[in-house]
Amino acid sequence: MSEGISLSAEFIDRVKASVKPHWGKLGWVTYKRTYARWLPEKGRSENWDETVKRVVEGNINLDPRLQDSPSLELKQSLTEEAERLYKLIYGLGATPSGRNLWISGTDYQRRTGDSLNNCWFVAIRPQKYGDSKIVPSYLGKQEKAVSMPFSFLFDELMKGGGVGFSVARSNISQIPRVDFAIDLQVVVDESSESYDASVKVGAVGKNELVQDADSIYYRLPDTREGWVLANALLIDLHFAQTNPDRKQKLILDLSDIRPYGAEIHGFGGTASGPMPLISMLLDINEVLNNKAGGRLTSVDAADICNLIGKAVVAGNVRRSAELALGSNDDQDFISMKQDQEKLMHHRWASNNSVAVDSAFSGYQPIAAGIRENGEPGIVNLDLSKNYGRIVDGYQAGIDGDVEGTNPCGEISLANGEPCNLFEVFPLIAEEQGWDLQEVFALAARYAKRVTFSPYDWEISREIIQKNRRIGISMSGIQDWLLTRLGNRVVTGFKDDFDPETHEAIKVPVYDKRAIKMVDQLYKAVVKADQDYSKTLGCNESIKHTTVKPSGTVAKLAGASEGMHFHYGAYLIQRIRFQNSDPLLPALKACGYRTEADIYTENTTCVEFPVKAVGADNPNFASAGTVSIAEQFATQAFLQTYWSDNAVSCTITFQDSEGDQVESLLRQYRFIIKSTSLLPYFGGSLQQAPKEPIDKETYEKRSQEITGNVEEVFSQLNSDVKDLELVDQTDCEGGACPIK
């Protein structure tokens, strides 16, 4: 293999001298606590220029042409492309996904093929493990097992990805009868540092172990794979097909699992100890044992996925993003979060949605649930399978393998398929002198290279090689359109009638300039993909564009999040920090208000005054003032003219608008592929993450801030390794993974 592409120190110095990163009010602080990796040789975390260098080099070297004796001409061409990408990302005119900011260019990326993708989807039905990195020793690679989708979900969650999963009837009906109840014993050596804490959650001392001929003993290695394989063995023992010897006692030895607080190499962070895994295994065994002699339901399967997610949250990842997708007439699934005890115990771990098609009409109970608690969301698989952009019309089976979506709902996915995201801030990129068509072309090529990663699971490798799906997103959409057009994209509504129900509806009128703007950029992405695919000799991407919810990445640039409207024209935005976080002294020294967090011990809440882009424009609207109808119409605009995947949107609504939910879901059934809704709270909670304020309060609070946090932090020189992130909010629905 040839020596890779690298960016010279001289080039980086020139960019640093000529380009100023477009940090938002929370931008640099958010970057430093979320994406800056620890540099052991320097005894500090990365600076932004170092992060961007790592990320760009990690990506450009995925070009498969570099594998075999590349020409000097090719290396020069890719070096020039890397330099353009570096300048673009350093200035924050565009960024790869948060996952790429954290992982790209690391040893972990080189070891772990799945590490660059944000989110995944898997169907909960018996599947073969195939030629994957994880295959239980008792199974043949081509042998179907009930455990496989749960293993896939567990593995990807522990790698920091989010996972959407389908418990629709068509999948759950393929799971065979639960044949055996399993007597599970979890043991820990008395000499283990974790012994006392493990016993408290249900383990027993190893000296108490009673092993007989009917039992299976497995000592878990201290690895991610060991956790997955233990759970797989437990699940598969319940089924005769994968337990032909009819063994009904399982002993899992967790003595080798590293204790709480120990360092985790690779992904980063610190270990949780064996306790969350012990609780998970015992709880999953209870779910399965309760169905011995019967069959698992969609709720049982979702519970197992939620219990896995709960264990991962308690572990190193700190958030496991899950979306459970059920059948639209499965009332037990739709109402499963009404069980308050189980909701508090584990059912909080997923956002729940139902699959519909355009002929579906039963929105009344769904709308009632949304008004009550914001669930379920809606995923229209019929539209996803047969449409790209809505304006391009019906294309039968254009994405026929689609079965679900990622947790945030912006990418329609086949079984085992991941999201592959990159986002552009069009207003910022234009202000920095970029041609937007070039920016979106660079974005498409970046995402295309990610599809050449060495994926760990066979189902993923096969579908990625077939689809090469990419998701080029734009963010700060409201900022861009309001600034460039002087108005919002929806300029009004006209009266009309639904062609099927004859119900009176109000059809949105869009600014034609906006249609032209996004259409040109869509075509630039498609053209870039076509050209690069031809060069690389691979399939063109099955779909190309999306709108991701953004959140953390949008905070870097200070842009509105995805298609969402700013939460208010002026805000107090609160971020929580561990009391030991070295950023806190710098923030206090700069005049930011801080107070003890009322929800979590040893945590400080820091308040940032924020002014939205365009706040002074008379046509500015916030999430607290824009109507539910305009939000639906805006999502429909982007689904029609920009996104051939889907558009992630959490529509917020006032109490007075709740009665419009049902009719609007019905009106847009031929356009919107996925959506979710939440009541607008407006910062009424104590220490709310976002609290709208007036202009006078904003100006007063801004005057209290007297220093530059980045400069003060550098002067204090008090970096600390492996801090836990506290309460990082990536998107309205809380569905995104933390990095």
From Swiss-Prot:
Keywords: Allosteric enzyme, Cobalamin, Cobalt, Disulfide bond, DNA replication, Oxidoreductase, Redox-active center. Residues 565-626 are annotated as: Adenosylcobalamin-binding-1. It is an enzyme of class 1 (oxidoreductase). The keyword Oxidoreductase applies. Pfam families: RNR-II_ins_dom, RNR_Alpha. Residues 147-158 are annotated as: Effector region-1. Residues 168-313 are annotated as: Effector region-2. Belongs to the class II ribonucleoside-triphosphate reductase family. Monomer. This is Adenosylcobalamin-dependent ribonucleoside-triphosphate reductase. It comes from Lactobacillus delbrueckii subsp. bulgaricus (strain ATCC 11842 / DSM 20081 / BCRC 10696 / JCM 1002 / NBRC 13953 / NCIMB 11778 / NCTC 12712 / WDCM 00102 / Lb 14). The gene is rtpR.
